[in-house]
């Protein structure tokens, strides 16, 4: 332990840290050079004042540099949310990932266990028979053979072991709730990323731009979820060509009906997995339409679809042809053989 972080704790409470100062601070955290009290002090100073784009970008760049990296195919996309919306929905981003992969777009999905629902991405995948506790080489093999791979955050970010206990003791949101979607170990350049607050979508888009993303949609559902909503309009900050455009998106713009929010509320991992299987078998309803909407957006971000309506058509074919379901079966086989 050292006192190198100490001066920056007081600074962080009174003014934004520069990119260089923030990088130094997070180097101290990730190298285990700070005491738990110092870590907590820095995290709460940032949270109380409000983190800046430079601070997000600095923390994300240090975290990316220290992760166990994965080589992904060209054009790979991540489909992920911050979690923390407290809405307990069915596993929409997870199902979306398989639908998009079934449409021929490589998906390098970064995720963890439950945060905002009773069943996070890793919980749902485990319930469906996939082994999520695999390392970078196995994930790369999955991406090459199946066109989809799941990167369990703790398996790829060993430096987080230093801050994990502090986060648990604080018991409140910190900058790390935002960093997950910004620190994909495969370094993908395209993202469909949901945020638990509409106030985060533009800053997160600015961070992804600073970190080299080519095209990304940062979204917040009008129903309060960290994905495009099927029950209301959603806010979007779209990054493309270094420019950010903000707009609202309604399900009907994609040719989809509006459904009551209650129809996408999830349950236990087993119940969510059952709904997931039914969706892959073609069951209609709010869950499928929510997945189609998010898949359509991902296909636009991946340049696989020209617009949302075409994206819905492609995503529908991925489900009804059995392509999305086949991806689940293949990934289950590959991860359990690892």
Swiss-Prot record:
Binding site residues for Mg(2+) 1: 93, 227
A GO CC annotation given for this chain: cytosol
Residue numbers binding anthranilate 1: 81, 112
One Pfam match: Glycos_trans_3N
Cofactor or coenzyme needed: Mg(2+)
EC number(s) per entry: 2.4.2.18
Pathway: Amino-acid biosynthesis; L-tryptophan biosynthesis; L-tryptophan from chorismate: step 2/5
Binding site for 5-phospho-alpha-D-ribose 1-diphosphate: 81, 84-85, 89, 91-94, 109-117, 121
GO BP annotation list: L-tryptophan biosynthetic process
Record-linked InterPro entries: Anthranilate_Pribosyl_Tfrase, Glycosyl_Trfase_fam3, Glycosyl_Trfase_fam3_N_dom, Glycosyl_Trfase_fam3_N_dom_sf, Nuc_phospho_transferase
Record bears the keyword Nucleus: no
Keywords: Amino-acid biosynthesis, Aromatic amino acid biosynthesis, Glycosyltransferase, Magnesium, Metal-binding, Transferase, Tryptophan biosynthesis
Binding site residues for Mg(2+) 2: 226-227
Superkingdom field: Bacteria
Cofactor: how bound: Binds 2 magnesium ions per monomer.
Chain sites annotated for binding anthranilate 2: 167
The protein's assembly and partners: Homodimer.
Functional note: Catalyzes the transfer of the phosphoribosyl group of 5-phosphorylribose-1-pyrophosphate (PRPP) to anthranilate to yield N-(5'-phosphoribosyl)-anthranilate (PRA).
Protein name stated in the entry: Anthranilate phosphoribosyltransferase
Native source organism of the sequence: Cereibacter sphaeroides (strain KD131 / KCTC 12085)
Highest classification ranks of the organism: Bacteria, Pseudomonadati, Pseudomonadota, Alphaproteobacteria, Rhodobacterales
Gene name per UniProt: trpD
